[in-house]
A protein has these predicted regions:
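Helix-loop element at the rim of GNAT/NAT acetyltransferase active sites that forms part
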Residues: 1-12
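Acetyl-CoA-dependent GNAT
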Residues: 10-70, 81-82, 87, 142-146, ...
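Short hydrophobic/aromatic beta-strand or adjacent loop that forms the aromatic wall/cage
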Residues: 32, 134-138
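Conserved beta-strand segments that form the floor/walls of ligand-binding pockets within enzyme
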Residues: 36, 48, 62-66, 75, ...
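Residue-level preference for beta-strand/loop junctions
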Residues: 59, 93, 133-135
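Conserved active-site alpha-helix within GNAT-family acetyltransferase domains
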Residues: 74, 78-79, 90, 103-121
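Conserved GNAT acetyl-CoA-binding A-motif
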Residues: 81, 88-100
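Conserved catalytic-core motifs of GNAT/GCN5-like acyltransferases
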Residues: 96-101, 113, 118-134
Length: 155
């Protein structure tokens, strides 16, 4: 989907082929919600929610997003984020969305902050990129209008 420079800014392997993404979509698990952005039949971005399956974490999901370098800064990332957050808020009723991002990825951090994410932690030397250890930020967003548990299932 994207050149190695794009995946260098993620915690994924730098050379995922299209076959890997096709396989991931074919073997999609019930707790995963993938999304792709296309322009004229070309995949220019992908994103997804990975909902937690543990009972005490069922209110949360991990978010991941990647946009092709040539399409960054053109609203693709914002469109993917908007769609995922709408799904999380209005369809899954999730309270908490979490993500990790390299601390020097200013463009992504700006997008996440504009979508309501806040920094919760810094993981020192957490990721390996081009032979160097780099810090990772843990960011999260809480539902703007948290859903309530039904009275019969509240603790």
């Amino acid at each position: 989907m994207a050149p190695p420079e794009v995946f260098a800014n993620t915690l994924q392997l730098p050379y995922p082929g299209i076959e890997l993404w096709v396989e991931r979509l074919k073997n999609n698990k019930p707790n995963e919600s993938p999304l792709v952005a296309e322009v004229d039949g070309q995949i220019v971005g992908c994103a997804g929610l990975h909902r937690e399956i543990e009972v005490r974490r069922a209110h949360a999901a991990q978010l991941g997003i990647t946009v092709d370098l040539a399409w960054q800064g053109q609203g693709i990332g914002r469109a993917l984020m908007t769609a995922l957050l709408d799904t999380a808020d209005n369809w899954f009723g999730l309270l908490r969305i979490e993500l990790q991002v390299f601390a020097d990825n200013a463009r992504a951090i700006k997008l996440y902050e504009s979508c309501g994410f806040v920094q919760e932690a810094v993981l020192k030397s957490h990721g390996l990129r081009n032979g160097d250890y780099v810090d990772t930020l843990v960011m999260a967003r809480l539902h703007p209008k948290p859903p309530r548990l039904r009275p019969e299932i509240q603790p």
